[in-house]
């Protein structure tokens, strides 16, 4: 087994078997047969132990050369078969980019977003403009400029989220009314704007309250505006959101930033076949002190404002019993409203 002829025969047999292996499984069996522990080349290495010491070195070189030759043939064939396998996998798993894609079911847009966009479209069609403001506000814009007294309950921590440190006079806005002040300070008169955004109050999340809610607020400041203009705007808004038969009424109320002030109710046919008056929001003529705070002469200009919660509007308009459904992110809640309604 240690003769050059025997080693050459073993190497030739191994290389021939390796060359004929056409799969990785066959090649693995060939390796076991010709390079494994009981292969002729392995037995030749074991036979070195019984040779005389003076012959062992030369015979060892021949055995190692023979095994290395067989191993190189195996490694080359292994690389070739692996490359062929990988190429076949790429072809089998290839993607035809010209094929039409598999349709993914469309998700549902949140009904609050759809309602906000519909409100915006309604007022833009009336010639109004959209206005925005920051959610982190100062007491100056959220309370002071809106004629809130220093001891007004709304300023308390039981109603308002304040930003640390205590003397920063910053808070999460409790209404979108600060946008009124920022707009009047930044724009030329007349002003007709609608602002829609998130507001924050320290309410517990329950069936009718949420600490984060969306509010729509309208402001008009021009020469000669009156409560009649306010009523006409509210009626048009109500018909756009509740249908052509909807109508509004106002009841005296108090807000620091309007005088006179009123709460507005809306009458409409609801989703369960009935009709009734429902409290909708607040409104009134802009208080002269608010106009003065923005450098506007109340003897020359007047204005009106109104504000409604979108969650509440959606809740009683669509007969939603629990406001928590609007914030839990369950797509099953959004789907009945339609993808793009």
Swiss-Prot record:
For this protein, the record's SUPFAM superfamilies field holds: Class II aaRS and biotin synthetases, tRNA-binding arm
The answer to whether keyword Oxidoreductase applies is no
EC number annotated for this UniProt entry = 6.1.1.20
The Swiss-Prot or TrEMBL record lists the needed cofactor(s) as: Mg(2+)
Q: Which domain of life is it from?
A: Bacteria
Binding positions (Mg(2+)): 259
- GO CC terms in record: cytoplasm
Q: How would you classify this enzyme at the top EC level?
A: ligase
Please give the positions of the paired cysteines in each disulfide bond: none
| An example Gene Ontology biological process | phenylalanyl-tRNA aminoacylation
Extent of the signal sequence: none
Xref: InterPro entries: aa-tRNA-synth_II, aa-tRNA-synth_II/BPL/LPL, Phe-tRNA-synth_IIc_asu, Phe-tRNA_ligase_II_N, Phe_tRNA_ligase_alpha1_bac, Phenylalanyl-tRNA_Synthase, tRNA-bd_arm
Keyword set, alphabetical order: Aminoacyl-tRNA synthetase, ATP-binding, Cytoplasm, Ligase, Magnesium, Metal-binding, Nucleotide-binding, Protein biosynthesis
Q: Spell out the reaction equation it catalyses.
A: tRNA(Phe) + L-phenylalanine + ATP = L-phenylalanyl-tRNA(Phe) + AMP + diphosphate + H(+)
Give the chief site where it resides.
cytoplasm
Subcellular locations according to the entry: Cytoplasm
Record's cofactor remark? Binds 2 magnesium ions per tetramer.
Tell me a Gene Ontology molecular-function term this record carries.
ATP binding
Q: Which PROSITE patterns match?
A: AA_TRNA_LIGASE_II
> Family, per the entry?
Belongs to the class-II aminoacyl-tRNA synthetase family. Phe-tRNA synthetase alpha subunit type 1 subfamily.
For this protein, the record's HAMAP family field holds: Phe_tRNA_synth_alpha1
Family annotation (PANTHER family): PHENYLALANINE--TRNA LIGASE, MITOCHONDRIAL, PHENYLALANYL-TRNA SYNTHETASE
User: Subunit structure, per the record?
Assistant: Tetramer of two alpha and two beta subunits.
What is the name of the protein in this document? Phenylalanine--tRNA ligase alpha subunit
Traced from the root, the source organism's taxonomic lineage reads:
Bacteria, Bacillati, Actinomycetota, Actinomycetes, Mycobacteriales
Name the gene behind this protein: pheS
């Amino acid at each position: 087994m240690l003769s050059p002829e025997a080693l050459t025969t073993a190497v030739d047999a191994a290389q021939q078997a390796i060359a004929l292996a056409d799969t990785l499984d066959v090649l693995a069996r060939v390796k076991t047969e010709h390079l494994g522990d009981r292969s002729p080349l392995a037995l030749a290495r074991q036979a070195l132990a019984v040779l005389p010491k003076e012959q062992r070195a030369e015979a060892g070189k021949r055995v190692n050369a023979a095994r290395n030759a067989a191993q190189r043939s195996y490694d080359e064939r292994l690389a070739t078969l692996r490359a062929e396998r990988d190429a076949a996998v790429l072809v089998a798993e290839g993607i035809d980019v010209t094929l039409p894609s598999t349709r993914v079911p469309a998700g549902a847009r949140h009904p609050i977003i759809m309602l906000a966009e519909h409100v915006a479209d309604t007022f833009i069609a009336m010639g109004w403009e959209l206005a925005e403001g920051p959610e982190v506000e100062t007491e100056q814009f959220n309370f002071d400029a809106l004629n809130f007294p220093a001891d007004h309950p709304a300023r308390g921590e039981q109603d308002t989220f304040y930003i640390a440190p205590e003397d920063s006079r910053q808070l999460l806005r409790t209404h979108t009314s600060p946008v009124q002040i920022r707009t009047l300070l930044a724009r030329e008169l007349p002003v007709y704007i609608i602002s829609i955004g998130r507001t924050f109050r320290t309410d517990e999340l329950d069936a009718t309250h949420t600490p984060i809610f969306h509010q729509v607020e309208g402001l008009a400041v021009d020469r000669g505006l009156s409560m009649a203009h306010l009523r006409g705007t509210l009626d048009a808004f109500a018909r756009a959101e509740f249908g052509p038969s909807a109508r509004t009424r106002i009841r005296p109320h108090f807000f620091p930033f309007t005088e006179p002030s009123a709460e507005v109710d809306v009458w409409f046919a609801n989703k369960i076949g009935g009709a009734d008056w429902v409290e909708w929001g607040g409104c009134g003529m802009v208080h002269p002190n608010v106009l003065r705070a923005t450098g506007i002469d109340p003897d020359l200009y007047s204005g009106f404002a109104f504000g409604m919660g979108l969650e509440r509007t959606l809740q009683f308009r669509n007969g939603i019993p629990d406001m928590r459904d609007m914030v839990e992110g369950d797509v099953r809640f959004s789907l009945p409203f339609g993808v793009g309604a």
